[in-house]
């Protein structure tokens, strides 16, 4: 047993403060993304999640420019992006995609401008890499309270909205008949989504945060038979792949001394592998069920 622990955990892992911070912030972000992600997939708003993550990158870039907490920048722009989607408004799925694309383009334009100023006007030459791909081991411990507060806020919002959000995600027309204010619930979900992508962007970067939002949720919905179980499983998978990615990234410093691999790479790779495995398992389960039905 001790041999396995020594093999998996390189020296100093449990005593490293950057690792502690990464585990706390990354785990919290993954938990929130896993919960919110299930409803995002069920509502067919994966593109909106991707768009808000990219829009939030403008806030991350601006935060480096003016010297504030990057998470605040991500949050402000993600919330503004959600507000923009709701303000322009659209009822049909195709129109929602058009609105999302417009907001995405505007956000990326601002991100390009702010990153240009970061590189040319300040000394933050690594801002683009940090904003787009994350730097989990560089997250300061002082960010933990704000990250946890944002995560708790998003989880409380989902808990309060759970039943109407679930009903409106499965059948919007039935939800409206039963008195659910579908558009209000949809906007509140967008706000929770903005909080989730902001947290994931600060950990694995704006570009790759969609994998942490959509991947665990898609896997869970393939495996679980009930929405409640899917939410719990998605959160568990998200935390598992994030902590696993942190461990592998830390160990990678010993594979190629002085040149570790990014956490985001391992997180996305683990999500992809689990998604492929879940698809294979689902196909095998369907074949077995069809065979049993034929024999009956």
List the predicted regions and their residue ranges:
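Membrane-interfacial amphipathic/re-entrant helices at transmembrane-helix boundaries
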Residues: 1-30
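Transmembrane helix-bundle core of multi-pass membrane transporters
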Residues: 6-12, 17, 103-161
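Hydrophobic alpha-helical transmembrane segments
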Residues: 23-28, 71-76, 98-102, 144-149, ...
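Hydrophobic core segments of alpha-helical transmembrane domains in multi-pass membrane transport
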Residues: 26-34, 60, 82-83, 108-112, ...
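Helix-loop-helix "hairpin" substructures at the membrane interface of multi-pass membrane proteins
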Residues: 29, 143-216
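Hydrophobic alpha-helical segments embedded in the membrane of multi-pass proteins
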Residues: 31, 35, 53-57, 79, ...
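Short loop segments and helix-boundary regions at transmembrane helix junctions
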Residues: 38-122, 220-235, 248, 252-256, ...
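Cytosolic-side transmembrane-helix boundaries in multi-pass membrane proteins
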Residues: 252, 259-296
């Amino acid at each position: 047993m001790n041999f396995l622990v020594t093999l998996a955990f390189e020296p100093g892992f449990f005593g490293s403060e950057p690792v502690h911070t990464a585990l706390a912030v990354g785990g919290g972000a993954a938990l929130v993304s896993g919960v919110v992600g299930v409803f995002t997939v069920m509502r067919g708003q994966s593109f909106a999640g991707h768009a808000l993550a990219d829009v939030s990158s403008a806030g991350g870039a601006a935060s480096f420019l003016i010297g504030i907490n990057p998470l605040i920048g991500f949050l402000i722009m993600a919330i503004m992006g959600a507000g923009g989607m709701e303000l322009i408004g659209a009822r049909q799925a195709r129109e929602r995609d058009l609105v999302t694309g417009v907001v995405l383009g505007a956000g990326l334009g601002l991100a390009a401008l702010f990153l240009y100023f970061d590189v040319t006007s300040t000394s933050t030459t690594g801002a683009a890499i940090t904003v787009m791909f994350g730097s989990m081991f560089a997250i300061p411990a002082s960010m933990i309270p704000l990250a946890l507060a944002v995560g708790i806020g998003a989880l409380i919002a989902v808990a309060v909205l759970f039943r109407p959000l679930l009903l409106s995600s499965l059948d919007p027309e039935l939800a409206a008949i039963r008195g659910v204010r579908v558009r209000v619930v949809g906007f509140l979900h967008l706000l929770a989504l903005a909080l989730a992508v902001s947290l994931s962007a600060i950990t694995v970067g704006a570009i790759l945060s969609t994998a942490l939002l959509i991947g665990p949720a898609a896997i869970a919905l393939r495996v679980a038979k009930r929405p409640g179980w899917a939410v719990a499983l998605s959160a568990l998978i998200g935390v598992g792949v994030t902590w696993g990615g942190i461990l592998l990234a830390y160990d990678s410093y010993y594979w190629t001394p002085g040149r570790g691999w990014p956490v985001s790479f391992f997180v996305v790779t683990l999500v992809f592998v689990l998604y492929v495995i879940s698809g294979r398992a689902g196909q095998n389960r369907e074949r077995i069920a069809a065979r049993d039905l034929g024999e009956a």
